[in-house]
UniProtKB/Swiss-Prot annotation:
UniProt family annotation: Belongs to the cytochrome P450 family.
Modification N-acetylthreonine, positions: T2
Alphabetical keyword list: Acetylation, Heme, Iron, Metal-binding, Monooxygenase, Oxidoreductase
UniProt-recorded name of the protein: Cytochrome P450 143
Subunit annotation: Interacts with the ferredoxin FdxE with high affinity (Kd=84 nM).
Enzyme class: oxidoreductase
EC number of the protein: 1.14.-.-
Short name of one Pfam family: p450
Gene symbol of the encoding locus: cyp143
GO terms, molecular function: heme binding; iron ion binding; monooxygenase activity; oxidoreductase activity, acting on paired donors, with incorporation or reduction of molecular oxygen
Cofactor: heme b
Coiled-coil blocks: none
């Protein structure tokens, strides 16, 4: 089969790269520049990567041609990936049902509870004088706050994280182990039981409310939603916690500025998400022939939209490789764009604002461990630091 763009002499040149060789692990700025410099469309590992701002944004806003369902709903999998793997109008219905629970107004009611958990988690670390911030905080923090909002027992946090880690590791292995399969089965059994229990005995939590509203989700839809949120819905905050603490450890003047002017924490958080989004690309599949970057992709072409490359493309003063702290919140695509823009973006901002503010309150001065060199796990579907050793007196 001929790859589009390479069918005959003199045709459009399609650059080919190997994803795992991109220099992403140490410096995403260099990694995304390598991809942008290769061309507007780059073929890697069976996917067409779109690297130009105008092409990426046009695709994000056009689900009719760039389908999420075809890219994200595994063939033959009876569990619907709600709401991610749906296109309008089905996706529109899911957003309408779910959006009220993740709106600023709804989250403001949960703020006192979320703040208490944030204070307690950092208080448990502050007296140690050191921590490995990814394992001790970043991986735990969004899960704990999610359980509070969603309505799952807090005592199940660690085993849910264990199941999640095993299932994600399984997806990266050519041959799953028996332990991987067992973890996937146990997670599904757990969620099935919790969904059924909340349907029988609903409470004020999100898991209950989406099953009893004016347009309730079916049991299989709620199960698919819960499965997605556990496996992939919390990565943005985990990654951003790590990158936030990394930058603060490096920059004592920035720490002092944010302590003196907490309103600027919001600007800082937006910059972290712009520079280091955990989900740097959005997968899509074309539903009809479409011309992008000078070449025509046929229907059924697997595409990845490089939002992280756009965020750093230098097209304006705010789209650089540097942390821009000018007092303003600037537009970026770290939370995606178009109808599939991150449903939990308001929650992520709230959680990160709470965490950075409370960390600086309890641990105002800290530093990186000697000889530490930050790297992300790469290649990986989600970008986050491998580890982050911090210390303070």
């Amino acid at each position: 089969m001929t790859t589009p763009g390479e069918d005959h002499a003199g045709s459009f040149y399609l650059p080919r790269l190997e994803y795992s060789t991109l220099p992403m692990a140490v410096d995403r700025g260099v990694g995304w520049k390598t991809l942008r410099d290769a061309g507007p469309v780059v073929f890697m590992n069976g996917w067409y990567y779109l690297t130009r701002r105008e092409d990426v944004l046009a695709a994000l806003r056009n689900p009719k041609v760039f389908s999420s369902r075809k890219a994200l709903q595994p063939p033959g999998n009876p569990l619907p990936v709600v709401p991610l793997a749906f296109d309008p109008p089905e996706h529109t219905r899911y957003r309408r049902i779910l959006q009220p629970y993740f709106s600023p107004a709804a989250l403001s009611k949960a703020l006192p509870s979320l703040r208490r958990h944030t204070v307690a988690m950092i208080d448990a670390i502050a007296g140690r004088g050191e921590c490995e911030a990814m394992a001790d905080l970043a991986n735990l923090f969004p899960f704990q706050l999610f359980l509070v909002l969603y309505g799952l027992p807090l005592e199940d946090r660690d085993r849910l994280i264990g199941w999640k880690d095993a299932v994600i590791a399984m997806s990266d292995r050519p041959h799953p182990t028996e332990a991987d399969v067992a973890a996937a089965r146990e997670l599904l059994e757990y969620l099935t039981a919790m969904v059924a229990e909340r349907r029988r005995n609903p409470g004020p939590d999100v898991l209950s409310q989406v099953q009893i509203g004016e347009d309730p989700l079916s049991e299989i839809e709620v199960l698919g939603l819960s499965h997605l949120l556990i496996l992939a819905g919390l990565d943005t905050v985990t990654a951003a916690v790590g990158f936030s603490l990394l930058e603060l450890a490096r920059r004592p003047q920035l720490r002092a500025m944010l302590r003196d002017n907490p309103k600027q924490i919001r600007v800082f958080i937006e910059e972290i998400v712009r520079l280091e989004p955990s989900a740097p690309v959005a997968p899509r599949v074309t539903t009809e022939p479409v011309t992008v970057g000078g070449m025509t992709l046929p229907a059924g072409s697997p595409v990845r939209l490089c939002m992280a490359a756009v965020n750093r493309d230098g097209s304006d003063a705010m789209s650089t490789d540097e942390l821009v702290m000018d007092g303003k919140v600037h537009r970026h695509w770290g939370f995606g764009g178009g109808p599939h823009r991150c449903l939990g973006s308001h929650l992520a901002r709230l959680e990160l604002t709470l965490l950075v503010g409370e960390w600086l309150n309890q641990i105002p001065d800290f530093e990186l461990a000697p000889d530490y060199a930050p790297e992300i796990r790469f290649p990986s579907k989600s970008f986050a630091l491998k580890n982050l050793p911090l210390r303070w007196s």
